[in-house]
Amino acid sequence: MSMLNTWVGYLSLLLFAIAYILIIFEEKIHLKKSKPIVLVGCLMWLFIGIYERMHGGEHGGGAHEFVEHLIAEIGGLFFFLLVAMTYVNTLTSLNVFQALRAWLLSKGMGFKSLFWATGTLTFFLSPLADNLTSALLMSTVAFAVGDGNKKFIVPAFVNIVVAANAGGAWSPFGDITTLMVWTAGKVHTLEFVYLILPSIVNWLIPAFIMSLFIPKGKPEAKKEVMAMKPGARRTMVCFILTIATGVSFHQFLHLPPFMGMMCGLGYLMFTSFYMKRWGIKKYLKKLGLEEDRREIDRADIFKQVERVEFDTLLFFFGVLTAVGALQYIGFLKIVGGGFYDFTGFTTANTSIGIFSAIVDNIPIMFAVLNMDLSMELDQWLLVTLTCGVGGSLLSIGSAAGVAVMGINRENYTFMAHLKWAPVIFLGYLGSIVTWWVVTMALR
């Protein structure tokens, strides 16, 4: 018996819609986005369980097996993100990103040079540090040197958001959606190379047009001294080795990549242990200073784990749990199958990118992955691209955009970003045309 036309189906759909309305208005009602979706996701499975108990074997009683498979998938992604976030927090605590910011501020560049510098650094930082971190870092730089100049700050912020999302689209580690596609085995590590040119085009078209409106002149050079703390370079090496280990587990050993990432967390744990026992002591001795246990902020890996953004991780859990329930009930097969059958793969995957600017791209990508679609590699590349860069169309369409809005709410608003939406859409279309050209050999 199908659950689609039962009270479980209707109630689950209603609860999912309510949860998403609360998520959309997170900033207005000051309710963390993880709270409604975690509750709703678990309630949906509660109702499914009650329904199966009431009807005995009529539905097959497969919820237990389905949830076990779902949790294995969620758990792998959860631990992967936990390690990545811990590394980013550790690098931040060691002043790696702050040192980069200080270096940029000291260069005394003109507004136009800063526009291109922040955009370029964001684009190439996103594949490693993720699009949210890179957008936050570069937007603080742009704001610091902007001197309140709205004509510079708004296009610079828009450029950073577009560059962050475009940069994250061509790497398994750049965005949660690309990570999901990669761990699902739909696009392998080296196959992401096909998305480099489309991602560059997606960023460069709006960046070039916006650069024509950047005011001439040069902001006052800021003298900010910020040195990296002891252990920063070792941690950066560990981060690179961790990514290599995660890729190797997935690509060559055919084991879940989160195991490689957890192995990398072990690298970081032993590095921090070394710094705690000997590194800081050597550093202070070199400076001719005495060690003061009360004053020294010792390298402690568990402090960085505590600082992980658990709201994001729990939101991720809630979304995947809720979408998994919709899949089990049968909604995804009907909605997804009908949409793709009616429009075709290319049109559907292009539309999904636009839709992801309105609704969070994580549930959209998870839904696509669970629709049992028989798409070839070129189409999986397209939906990976569009789901990653489509959020740039609106300021609230991506985590990077929402975070950057918090840097300067007075100037960078929803409407300020919307004014540049036609230009961003040109980049979106340009990236799809580029995708079509670079993947011709795959068809």
Feature map (PLM): residue ranges:
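Structural signature of hydrophobic alpha-helical transmembrane segments
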Residues: 3-15, 72-83, 126-135, 195-206, ...
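Membrane-core helix-loop-helix motifs of multi-pass transport proteins
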Residues: 148-240, 244-252, 403-434
